[in-house]
């Protein structure tokens, strides 16, 4: 295996996990803050708000998992090596 391709794969996998975690992390923080604010304003709607929050958090977390899958593919099943 070419050492340059190997080093680039490690760097790319690190970047894919790091960059894939930034957006969902910010989004999850914002969504949780807005959910807490919504529950504080309307306590009777807590069940609907919490259900919607958990579903949206799962969708946001899936983006981070996709970044992890790309990183693992680059590390262990690299298509750029012969």
Swiss-Prot record:
Family as reported in the entry's similarity comment: Belongs to the ATPase C chain family.
Source taxon at top rank: Eukaryota
Oligomer status and interactors: F-type ATPases have 2 components, F(1) - the catalytic core - and F(0) - the membrane proton channel. F(1) has five subunits: alpha(3), beta(3), gamma(1), delta(1), epsilon(1). F(0) has four main subunits: a(1), b(1), b'(1) and c(10-14). The alpha and beta chains form an alternating ring which encloses part of the gamma chain. F(1) is attached to F(0) by a central stalk formed by the gamma and epsilon chains, while a peripheral stalk is formed by the delta, b and b' chains.
Residues the record marks as site: Reversibly protonated during proton transport: 61
Job description of the protein: F(1)F(0) ATP synthase produces ATP from ADP in the presence of a proton or sodium gradient. F-type ATPases consist of two structural domains, F(1) containing the extramembraneous catalytic core and F(0) containing the membrane proton channel, linked together by a central stalk and a peripheral stalk. During catalysis, ATP synthesis in the catalytic domain of F(1) is coupled via a rotary mechanism of the central stalk subunits to proton translocation. Key component of the F(0) channel; it plays a direct role in translocation across the membrane. A homomeric c-ring of between 10-14 subunits forms the central stalk rotor element with the F(1) delta and epsilon subunits.
Misc remark: In plastids the F-type ATPase is also known as CF(1)CF(0).
GO cellular component, one term: chloroplast thylakoid membrane
Pfam families, A to Z: ATP-synt_C
UniProtKB keywords: ATP synthesis, CF(0), Chloroplast, Hydrogen ion transport, Ion transport, Lipid-binding, Membrane, Plastid, Thylakoid, Transmembrane, Transmembrane helix, Transport
Membrane topology: Multi-pass membrane protein
Gene name of the record: atpH
Cellular compartments annotated: Plastid, Chloroplast thylakoid membrane
Name the record gives this protein: ATP synthase subunit c, chloroplastic
PANTHER family: ATP SYNTHASE LIPID-BINDING PROTEIN, MITOCHONDRIAL (PTHR10031), ATPASE PROTEIN 9 (PTHR10031:SF0)
Any one GO molecular function term: lipid binding
HAMAP family referenced in this protein's UniProt entry, alphabetically: ATP_synth_c_bact
Classification via InterPro entries: ATP_synth_csu_bac/chlpt, ATP_synth_F0_csu, ATP_synth_F0_csu_DDCD_BS, ATP_synth_F0_csu_sf, ATPase_proteolipid_c-like_dom, F/V-ATP_Csub_sf
Stretches that traverse the bilayer: 7-27, 57-77
Source organism of this protein record: Rhodomonas salina
């Amino acid at each position: 295996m070419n050492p340059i391709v190997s080093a680039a794969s490690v760097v790319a996998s690190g970047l894919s996990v790091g960059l894939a975690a930034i957006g969902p992390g910010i989004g999850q923080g914002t969504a949780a803050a807005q959910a807490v604010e919504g529950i504080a304003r309307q306590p009777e709607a807590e069940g609907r708000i919490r259900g919607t929050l958990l579903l949206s958090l799962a969708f946001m977390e899936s983006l981070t998992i996709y970044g992890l899958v790309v990183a693992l593919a680059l590390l262990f099943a690299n298509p750029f090596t012969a």
